[in-house]
C-alpha cells in the first residue's frame, strides 16, 4: 500500500504544488485547496499512472488521499 500512497503523493505534490508534508492519508483535496479543474487533472494523472479508468461517479466519491489510494488498490 505504501508504494501506491507514495505514487499518489508524488502526483498530488506535482499537480497541486503543495509540500510533501501536507499530504497524508487523511488529507482531503479540499484541504489542499484543489478546485474542480485540479481534481479532473489529478484523476487523469492517476488513471495514467496506474493504468485504470475512474468513472466520473467514482471520482466524485474520492475526497481524500486515502480514498484515492483505496480506490486504486481495489481497481488495479
UniProtKB/Swiss-Prot annotation:
Judging by the UniProt lineage, the source's domain of life is Bacteria
Where is each Carrier domain found? 2-76
Instruction: Keywords in alphabetical order, please.
Output: Cytoplasm, Fatty acid biosynthesis, Fatty acid metabolism, Lipid biosynthesis, Lipid metabolism, Phosphopantetheine, Phosphoprotein
Q: What intrachain disulfides are recorded?
A: none
Query: What pathway is it annotated to?
Result: Lipid metabolism; fatty acid biosynthesis
Phosphoprotein as a keyword?
yes
Q: Which Pfam families match?
A: PP-binding
Decide whether keyword Lipid biosynthesis is in the record: yes
Kindly list the places in or outside the cell where this protein is found, as annotated in its UniProt entry: Cytoplasm
GO MF, one term, reads: phosphopantetheine binding
Task: Provide GO CC annotations from the record.
Answer: cytosol; membrane
Q: Per its UniProt record, what InterPro entries does this chain match?
A: ACP (IPR003231), ACP-like_sf (IPR036736), PKS_PP-bd (IPR020806), PP-bd_ACP (IPR009081), Ppantetheine_attach_site (IPR006162)
Q: Locate the O-(pantetheine 4'-phosphoryl)serine modifications and list their residues.
A: 36
UniProt record, GO biological process: lipid A biosynthetic process
PTM comment: the record says: 4'-phosphopantetheine is transferred from CoA to a specific serine of apo-ACP by AcpS. This modification is essential for activity because fatty acids are bound in thioester linkage to the sulfhydryl of the prosthetic group.
- What family does the entry list? Belongs to the acyl carrier protein (ACP) family.
Its annotated function is as follows: Carrier of the growing fatty acid chain in fatty acid biosynthesis.
- HAMAP family registered for this protein in UniProt: Acyl_carrier (MF_01217)
Name the UniProt record assigns to this protein: Acyl carrier protein
Q: Which organism is it from?
A: Heliobacterium modesticaldum (strain ATCC 51547 / Ice1)
Identify the gene encoding this protein.
acpP
Amino acid at each position: 500500500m505504501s508504494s501506491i500512497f507514495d505514487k499518489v503523493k508524488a502526483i498530488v505534490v506535482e499537480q497541486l504544488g503543495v509540500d510533501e508534508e501536507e499530504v497524508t492519508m487523511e488529507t482531503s483535496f479540499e484541504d489542499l485547496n484543489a478546485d474542480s479543474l485540479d481534481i479532473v487533472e489529478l484523476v487523469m494523472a492517476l488513471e495514467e499512472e496506474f493504468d485504470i479508468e475512474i468513472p466520473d461517479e467514482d471520482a466524485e466519491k474520492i475526497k481524500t488521499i486515502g480514498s484515492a489510494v483505496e480506490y486504486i488498490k481495489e481497481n488495479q
